[in-house]
Design a protein with these regions (language model features):
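Glycosyltransferase catalytic domains, chiefly GT-A lineage
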Residues: 1-178
Length: 178
């Protein structure tokens, strides 16, 4: 599953290699909410995991996960804030407990988004991609960026949504992404 508001800055091949190496039924990506005043509220209302780049293998266990998820989404896929569901994504928080054999993608270059942008700094652009520093210490290659909350206000104006989130942002990184 790939969310429609994402852009790939480099091939996800090494993310697939990570997933294949884990022999899992499915993979999910953490929101990676920054450790700030809004973290616990974001986790409670939006869930630990983001529906953006979910991988499923053609196995019986994977089909069980997909069938259960589909059923839950038919029951409620509301974006109204509550503690039970949020669209199609809060259900992902139950996958590890319910099904096991779920891999949480470790590569921090996958899943960069407005809500976690304050934890990233632009390190540089090289011939093979854009490199970031995650949480001040980990060098990662940008795989994809999730353009959530992008709004066209009129023909010439776009609200990019990154300043709606708490935390200091790297302007050079924002300029590179947008």
């Amino acid at each position: 599953y790939i969310d429609a508001d994402m852009y790939f800055y480099s091939s996800p091949e090494f993310v697939f290699e990570e997933i294949k190496g884990k022999k899992c039924s499915a993979s999910i990506i953490e929101h990676r909410f920054p450790n700030n005043i809004t973290r616990s509220t974001n986790l409670r209302l939006h869930g630990k995991y983001c529906v953006e780049f979910n991988t499923f293998f053609n196995t019986e266990e994977s089909r069980k996960i997909l069938t259960w998820w589909k059923k839950k989404c038919f029951e409620s896929c509301s974006m109204k804030l509550n503690e039970e569901s949020f669209g199609d994504q809060k259900y992902l928080d139950e996958w590890e407990k319910r099904f096991g054999n779920i891999h949480e993608v470790e590569n921090a270059g996958a899943g960069v988004a407005p809500w976690n942008l304050s934890d990233y700094r632009l390190e540089g652009k090289e011939s093979n991609g854009i490199y970031l520093t995650y949480k001040g210490k980990q060098r990662v290659k940008l795989v994809f960026y999730h353009f959530q909350n992008l709004r066209f206000l009129d023909e010439n104006t776009v609200n990019i949504g990154v300043y709606n989130e708490i935390g200091r942002k790297d302007r050079a990184l924002i300029n590179e992404l947008y």
